[in-house]
Regions:
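N-terminal Rossmann-like FAD-binding beta1-loop-alpha1 element of flavoenzymes
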Residues: 3-30
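Short hydrophobic core segments
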Residues: 7-8, 31, 238-251
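Short, well-ordered alpha-helices that flank and scaffold nucleotide-derived cofactor binding pockets
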Residues: 19, 23, 43, 208, ...
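Short catalytic/ligand-binding loop motif for oxyanion handling, primarily in non-cytosolic enzymes
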Residues: 38-40, 86-89, 94-96, 103, ...
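Dinucleotide-binding Rossmann-like beta1-alpha1 core, especially the glycine-rich loop
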Residues: 48-121
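C-terminal segments that line or cap access tunnels to active or ligand-binding sites in enzymes
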Residues: 242-243, 251-389
């Protein structure tokens, strides 16, 4: 009889664990609450022919060659360099802020002064962080840092997180880059690609294995019970000793027994437009008075040729409420929330066959390549733990 495994959630974390266990000979029951696979990577085609990302734009970028090679088993890629503009003082400028942004927003004499001083103070750097500028002893450099902080970061962050910037984790602020040059790429990774047929076919191929049985539109928690006294997981009323791979919310798995983990969510508003293109870049950020944070135009990413048709997406940040209409997107990083997650993590360790992987299970924001890498690592750990169980 084949060894049994259960995977909960079929985004990247769950789908990769399902595939890896299936290839190792496990019979995998993969349960997904949504009506589709792919998690937040899900991509579909609208009536006008434009492929869109249902849960906001996703771009594959990495310095991890092994991650690219792994995903290449399930898709081919085409080169794509992501560029983002921000609307500041009525003008569209590159984000991250760079020398082109400086030239666009300041008089020539002032812009030249800023650029000269930046190159003089950071001669061997192509990127610096906003905190380095704000706290720099040179008043001109600190003044530029304050301008960027106020016009690029403060209001955007307040909208994104629903709180004043003073309450946002300082690690978020410290990571805001400023480019010392005219490089307008949003990412600096060595590999920047998009899947030729979109993201959804990756998951279709990844999950197309005879050892994987998928169930969609099903809440795994209707069939799973936790026996804390016996430290066992029950499935359909019977103890289940095989791996249980959780990529869904860890607080939901434990019935919110320690309270819900807070997230920010997004209200996604798609608009079909009867024009060739709506904006000059795939993403334009709106860091000031608008209620939405950014507008995405997907044709810039998919490279589709559809004259007279395009689709845009406006993202409105909102609070997340468990059981509501909207999905959890961004874990809210602060000591109180992290302590609550650590308590859930301690609870999970009572169950030796329970494995947590992914943004919702680990209460941690992951870039795409990082969650692929993490899922492969957790899969190796599972196979090691169950190596003698054959």
């Amino acid at each position: 009889m084949k060894r049994q495994a259960i995977v909960i959630g079929l985004g990247f974390a769950g789908s990769i664990m399902a595939r890896e266990l299936a290839e190792a000979g496990f019979s995998v029951l993969a349960i997904e609450k949504r009506s589709h696979i792919g998690g937040n990577m899900y991509e579909y085609e609208r009536k006008n022919g434009v492929r869109v990302h249902m849960y906001g734009p996703h771009i594959f970028h990495t310095n991890r060659r092994e991650v690219f090679d792994y995903l290449s088993r399930f898709t081919s890629f085409y080169p794509y360099t992501h560029r983002v503009l921000g609307k500041i003082n009525g003008k569209l400028v590159p984000i991250p802020f760079n020398f082109t942004s400086v030239d666009t927003l300041f008089p020539k004499e002032k812009a030249d002064l800023y650029k000269t001083k930046l190159l003089g103070q950071f001669p061997d750097r192509d990127r610096v962080y906003i905190s380095e500028l704000i706290h720099h002893p040179d008043p001109d450099i600190s003044s530029l840092g304050d301008f960027i902080f106020e016009n690029v970061f403060v209001h955007y962050t307040a909208k994104q997180w629903g709180m004043p910037v003073s309450q946002v984790d300082t690690s978020v602020i410290n990571r805001v880059p400023v480019v010392l040059g005219t490089d307008d790429r949003y990412f600096a990774d060595t590999i920047q690609m998009m899947p030729t047929e979109g993201f959804t076919p990756i998951f279709e191929k990844m999950l197309a294995h005879p050892n994987i049985h998928m169930i969609l539109e099903s809440d795994a928690m209707d069939r799973i019970k936790i026996d804390s006294d016996e430290r066992s997981i029950l499935f359909d009323g019977a103890p289940f000793s095989g791996p249980v791979c959780l990529s869904g919310p860890v607080d939901e798995f434990f019935k919110y027994s320690l309270g819900p983990l807070p997230y920010r969510s997004l209200d996604m508003k798609f608009e079909d437009q009867n024009v060739d293109y709506y904006q000059p870049a795939s993403v334009v950020n709106y860091p000031n008075e608008e209620l939405f944070t950014r507008i995405t135009e997907f044709k810039h990413m998919t490279l589709q040729v559809l004259p007279g048709h395009t689709t845009i997406l406006k993202e409105y940040p909102i609070p997340y409420r468990p059981g509501g209409l909207f999905s959890p997107y961004y874990p809210i990083s602060n000591p109180e929330n992290q302590n609550r997650y650590e308590a859930y993590l301690d609870m999970s360790r009572r169950f030796p066959n329970l494995y947590l992987c992914g943004r919702l299970a680990e209460y941690k924001y992951y870039n795409m390549d990082a969650v692929v890498d993490r899922a492969l690592m957790v899969s190796r750990s599972i196979l090691h733990d169950f190596a003698s169980d054959k």
